Amino acid sequence: MWRRADIRVRIRPKLSAGIFFSQQSRWEGRSMFRLHKWYLDVVTDTGDALILYAGTVECGRIAFDYASVLQYRDGVNRDVQSVRRVAQPRLQADAVTWCSGPLRVEGQWIRDAQEIQRTLVNGPDGLINWTCHMPRAQATVQLHGERIAGLGYVESLTLNIPPSKLPFRTLQWGRHLSDRHWLVWIGWAGCGDRRWIWMDGEEQPAAALVDCAPSRLNGGARLRLSSPRDVRDRNVLEALTGVPATMTRRIAGSLAGMHEHKQVSRSSLVIADHAIDQGWALHEVVTR
């Protein structure tokens, strides 16, 4: 494993609460916490996975940018992060590009499926807006001079709900991509069960999550996961390396019990025990 962590912190001007909220967007009118996060990935034909994150965290008057790269190849995980000179991905028509000098990564995702947008939460504790910019894409990434190509996925998330008030005890998320089909799912449990599942651009209101995979899809299909490999299995607090100490103290308590388990699996859509495609799924379970 190789890791780097550099720090770039921004301090807001100190304003009274009334002035602060009057100058902020609707996101910050309810909370002093805000997160905007990009998630991008690519999985090769052989199941090697590359996951990239970029975003901004704001907590009170403290704000910082961050980016990280998680690579799984041949059973080995490599994790590198930076919170200095962080560039955000650029969305232009049917392409997303991202380049990070500190991380030595440059990538492009070309759209192969239409965007999905949902407001997952809009309540007294705040908002969660989710946009799946590219449920399936043709992705090419250069990492430390190595070319990695395959089917990829791009989403972004914006929320202003503090970690202690997230509306779930267990979160399930995943995406399955093949040359013929794609599938995206989000499921919450523990604080009011919710789920959102799409297959090939159509929402699946009758579908369910069974053993962490979508079932009861249109046409009687279900997703079969096999040969899972751990990409990340850790307490979320371990991700705070390099985060400003002031920020860490503010959010560490609410993250103390949060755990993430991310896997890459061989995956197939199955109808009546017959596989109609074959691809790769990235999926995770987060508990708190």
Name these PLM-found stretches:
Residues 1-288:
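Targeting-peptide/extracellular-domain and disordered-appendage signature
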